[in-house]
């Protein structure tokens, strides 16, 4: 989804993910209209917005699993969560990230990866919406993100990329 500033790209992403209500027309994702983020999540829609969303005082592992009570890893032990955090962050970032490091000690690109990683942790994802999610990433990181998106696509996940530029 490509367009200039203010043309409605992010609004569409928010409607598709149940964050904003529809005021005109109809939006159908997987045959349904998501009316809340919870409904969208239950439908298998994972959304990553441009804003980097981390709790600065929390660790990498706590940031990754925040709000995860109803997901498949709810029965993971803390040790299993730490191992999963190490695995996903190393896979996405391309280097080791200490899962116990507090977010305020991390660079903006690593914080962006935490935000993105939450969507990749979801087991039931059928649709991934990335709304300017690579804005805080450098070229190599963006390449890694696109590689991961291709892997998801190859596994049957629909990927929507919202951007104002094609690079």
List each language-model region with its residue ranges:
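Glycine-rich phosphate-binding loops of nucleotide-dependent enzymes
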Residues: 1-167
